[in-house]
């Protein structure tokens, strides 16, 4: 029996509102249940609570894993949560797991929760992440010194708008992603004004609007996602990330400021879980420890929603049907 309660995602972008979860095709479901011995073992009948945030890969990945759990006979519930506060929710057991712990955006919140206890590190995905200031390649024509951040600052006037006056405009991620763009601008003495996008969709809209006339833009971006295949571009190279850059002013080029360096260029993408998950849902937890996605797989998940305009649950079903050779070994152990 399936128990499912859905709370719609609040992303105003192309992800839209999530529809009711759909089951796999009968053939696929039968194959999973027949070949997966985990399905016969008893996990708790209480639902595993999976959080939904405001970017597409996380929403689709959550649906992918949720559908796998449901086909194992485990109930699943999706809830919309803040992407920073979720680690406290996992720690307290209000949310069961988190599938995309990005080092640059959420590492600090994750570490703080680990120190308090109640949350466990369930391991890394194969994916390597980067999150930072980024520009499409046509921007380099207007600012040929890129990707050096000093060259970007020298070109600030190229990025000025009516909104920012004589300062360059940088479109950062949503406020809850805590990217500290304003602190970096101040720490490095940059002639830029930081504007926060309301959603991931607003970032893609900014790039798309600039593409027609090849207007130079600099925005927050990350990898993996679909954008790298649609708009070739580069990350701005800031002073290299050093541990402590966000905590100790002595670390980094400005001895009086924090956040005076770039984000990690080879960041982790982790999974986290409530420490009680293994005892309450041992079979599902065992599968979670084996789940690992690559950069191309995560980019494809985002593309199904952001480019192909599928609903997240439909995108998850399509991804699972096309990648049975990837996820079946997670079930078989």
Swiss-Prot record:
UniProt activity-regulation remark: Binds a Ca(2+) ion, which has little effect on either the binding affinity or the secondary structure, but plays an important role in maintaining the stability of TmoX. It may modulate the protein stability in response to biological needs and environmental changes. Thermostability is dramatically decreased when Ca(2+) is removed by EDTA.
Taxonomic path: Bacteria, Pseudomonadati, Pseudomonadota, Alphaproteobacteria, Rhodobacterales
Outcome after substituting residue 102 to A: Nearly complete abrogation of the TMAO-binding affinity
Function: Part of the ABC transporter complex TmoXWV involved in trimethylamine N-oxide (TMAO) import. Is specific for TMAO and essential for TMAO metabolism. Binds TMAO with high affinity. In vitro, also presents a high binding affinity for choline, however this transporter seems specific for TMAO and the choline-binding affinity presented by recombinant TmoX may not make physiological sense.
Disruption of the gene: reported phenotype: Mutant shows significant reduced growth on TMAO as a sole nitrogen source. Growth on trimethylamine (TMA), glycine betaine (GBT), choline and carnitine is unaffected.
Domain notes: Can alternate between open and closed states for binding TMAO.
Effect annotated for changing residue 55 to A: Nearly complete abrogation of the TMAO-binding affinity
Assembly notes: The complex is probably composed of two ATP-binding proteins (TmoW), two transmembrane proteins (TmoV) and a solute-binding protein (TmoX). Monomer in solution, but forms homodimers in crystals.
Organism domain of life: Bacteria
Effect of residue 102 to F: Significant decrease in the TMAO-binding affinity
Protein name: Trimethylamine N-oxide-binding protein
Signals that turn on the gene: Expression is induced by TMAO.
This protein's encoding gene: tmoX
Entry keywords, A to Z: Calcium, Metal-binding, Periplasm, Signal, Transport
Sites where the protein binds Ca(2+): 249, 251, 254, 257, 260
Localization (cell): Periplasm
Binding locations of trimethylamine N-oxide: 55, 102, 131, 177, 222
